[in-house]
């Protein structure tokens, strides 16, 4: 039995990517044969995943974990697999947040919502990042077992020493410095942080 993860993008610092990497590490430590496949692999993470288009054939005994967070044709390939299928639902941002801001992202989000609905009766089990996400899946017709499990956080990242260069640049500069960690996007409400 292999446990394979599929996700659209593996990117440094991304929460979904961190979750996939942490799951891989835990599964490996438990002795499972495990791999990650992604459509896009950021250069910093080359070697941590394989190209999704080169994914090996699965057997009935295998388990595929599909990280769902945006629209991609990968969802339809996942649907067709004959092994055990688990969807890890990371939520899809409501498309209206991107009106007049980023039409490409809005199209991917609308597509993601449609694919979420299409997968409703085609997965064996779901993990949702929150109770809200779980209820969202139920409202879309998911009847399979769904459990809530927050994303894994790479806690060792918090043990790293801060960049001396950055500290020197901002400490004692006479300003109040606000650090926002996340993508720049209307739904992240950077203006509320300020």
Where are these regions (language model features)?
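Nucleotide-activated donor-dependent transferases that construct or modify glycoconjugates
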Residues: 1-12
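Conserved donor-binding loops in enzymes that form glycosidic bonds
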Residues: 8-10, 69, 151, 177-185
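Short amphipathic alpha-helix
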Residues: 16-27
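A short beta-strand-loop structural module common to alpha/beta enzyme folds
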Residues: 33-43
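Extended catalytic core of nucleotide-activated donor transferases of GT-like folds
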Residues: 44-122
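Donor nucleotide-sugar binding/catalytic pocket of nucleotide-sugar-dependent glycosyltransferases
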Residues: 117-164, 172
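Conserved donor-binding/catalytic core segment of Leloir-type glycosyltransferases
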Residues: 127, 168-188, 194
């Amino acid at each position: 039995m292999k446990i394979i993860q599929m996700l659209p993008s593996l990117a440094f610092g991304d929460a979904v990517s961190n979750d996939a990497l942490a799951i891989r590490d835990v599964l490996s430590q438990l002795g499972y044969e495990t791999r990650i496949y992604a459509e896009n692999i950021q250069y910093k993470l080359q070697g941590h995943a394989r190209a999704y288009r080169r994914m090996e054939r699965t057997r009935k005994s295998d388990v595929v974990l599909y990280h769902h967070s945006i629209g991609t044709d990968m969802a339809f390939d996942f649907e067709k697999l004959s092994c055990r299928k688990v969807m890890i639902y990371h939520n899809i941002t409501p498309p209206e947040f991107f009106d007049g801001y980023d039409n490409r992202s809005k199209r991917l989000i609308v597509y993601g919502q449609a694919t979420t609905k299409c997968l409703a009766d085609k997965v064996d089990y779901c993990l949702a990042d929150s109770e809200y996400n779980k209820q969202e899946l139920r409202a879309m017709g998911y009847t399979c077992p769904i459990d809530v499990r927050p994303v894994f956080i790479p806690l060792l990242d918090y043990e790293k020493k801060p960049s001396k260069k950055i500290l020197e640049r901002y400490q004692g500069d006479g300003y109040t410095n606000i650090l926002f960690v996340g993508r720049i996007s209307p739904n992240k409400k950077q203006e509320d942080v300020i």
